[in-house]
From Swiss-Prot:
Binding site for ATP: L15, S16, G17, G18, M19, D20, S21, T22, V23, C24, A25
An annotated Gene Ontology molecular function: zinc ion binding
Keywords: ATP-binding, Ligase, Metal-binding, Nucleotide-binding, Queuosine biosynthesis, Zinc
UniProt: Zn(2+) binding residues: C197, C205, C208, C211
Family: Belongs to the QueC family.
Cofactor note: Binds 1 zinc ion per subunit.
Cofactor: Zn(2+)
Pathway: Purine metabolism; 7-cyano-7-deazaguanine biosynthesis
Protein name: 7-cyano-7-deazaguanine synthase
Originating species: Koribacter versatilis (strain Ellin345)
Enzymatic reactions: 7-carboxy-7-deazaguanine + NH4(+) + ATP = 7-cyano-7-deazaguanine + ADP + phosphate + H2O + H(+)
Primary role: Catalyzes the ATP-dependent conversion of 7-carboxy-7-deazaguanine (CDG) to 7-cyano-7-deazaguanine (preQ(0)).
Gene assigned in the entry: queC
Length: 237
C-alpha cells in the first residue's frame, strides 16, 4: 500500500494508543500533515485506561500531533457487560476460537460512541475525514469493526451533520494484522510507544486476545514486538 500526501484539509483520528490506531494515525499524518490532524482519545472505564492514555500522548507527540482531545465516558463502566469495563468479568486467555465468536472483551456498541464524539469534534474543527483503525479480518470478531457498520454509520453522519460532508474512513479494515505491522514498519509508526494489552499496565500479559493477535502479527511480519511482555514470554521482549 503506497501512501501519498493528499489535500490540505483537516482530519480527526481516533487514537487509542494501540497498534492499529497508531498505524492509522501515521497514515493520516502522511496524508494531511500533523498540523492538520486532531487526535481524539477516549477513556471509557477500561482496565488499562491510564496506560492507554499514556500511549496516546506519547504517540501523538512522536507524530507531531499537537491538537489533541482526551475525554472520559464513565457510563460504559456503569453499563457493564464487558470484561474490559466490568471487574466482575475476567479477561480470558485467547482461545482457539479467537476471531470466530464475539468475545467477552467486546464493549457493547463502543465504536458508535467513539465515532459520535469524533464527528462532533470534526464539525467544530472543520475536518472532513475521521480515521479509525478498525480491522475486520484476522481480528477479535467485534461487530462494530465490520465494513457494513461503517457504511451505515457514514449514512447517519451525512444525514445528521450540518454540512453533511464528514466521512469516516477505515484504511486498515481489509488488512490482516501482519500486513498492518508491515505497513507500520514501512511508515515508521512508533510501535515502541503503543499499548495493546487488555489486562495489565506494567507489562503486556501476552495471553489475552489482543496480545496474542499482536504477537502473531509481528511474527507474521518477520519482526520483533518492541513492547515488554510478562516474564513467561521473555523471549518476546
Amino acid at each position: 500500500m503506497k501512501v501519498q500526501r493528499g489535500d490540505t484539509g483537516k482530519a480527526v483520528v481516533v487514537l487509542s494508543g494501540g497498534m492499529d490506531s497508531t498505524v492509522c494515525a501515521t497514515l493520516a499524518v502522511r496524508e494531511y500533515g500533523a498540523e492538520n490532524i486532531g487526535a481524539l482519545h477516549v477513556s471509557y472505564g477500561q482496565r488499562t485506561a491510564a496506560r492507554e492514555k499514556q500511549a496516546f500522548a506519547a504517540v501523538a507527540e512522536r507524530l507531531g500531533i499537537q491538537t489533541r482531545l482526551a475525554v472520559e465516558t464513565p457510563f460504559f463502566r456503569a453499563i457493564g457487560g464487558s470484561a474490559l469495563t466490568d471487574a466482575n468479568i475476567a479477561v480470558p486467555d485467547a482461545g482457539e476460537l479467537i476471531g470466530h465468536e464475539i468475545p467477552v472483551t467486546y464493549v457493547p456498541f463502543r465504536n458508535a460512541h467513539l465515532l459520535a464524539m469524533a464527528v462532533s469534534w470534526a464539525e467544530v474543527l472543520g475536518a472532513s475525514k475521521i480515521y479509525i483503525g478498525a480491522v475486520a479480518q484476522d481480528s477479535s470478531g467485534y461487530p462494530d469493526c465490520r465494513p457494513e457498520f461503517y457504511e451505515a454509520y457514514n449514512l447517519a453522519v451525512r444525514r445528521g451533520t450540518k454540512a453533511g460532508d464528514i466521512e469516516v474512513v477505515t484504511p486498515l479494515i481489509a488488512l490482516r494484522k501482519h500486513e498492518i505491522v508491515s505497513l507500520g514498519l514501512e511508515l515508521g509508526a512508533p510501535f515502541d510507544l503503543t499499548w495493546s494489552c487488555y489486562s495489565r499496565e506494567d507489562c503486556a500479559c501476552g495471553v489475552c486476545d489482543s496480545c496474542v493477535l499482536r504477537l502473531r502479527a509481528f511474527e507474521g511480519a518477520g519482526a520483533v514486538d518492541p513492547v515488554p511482555y510478562a516474564p513467561r514470554l521473555a523471549g518476546h521482549d
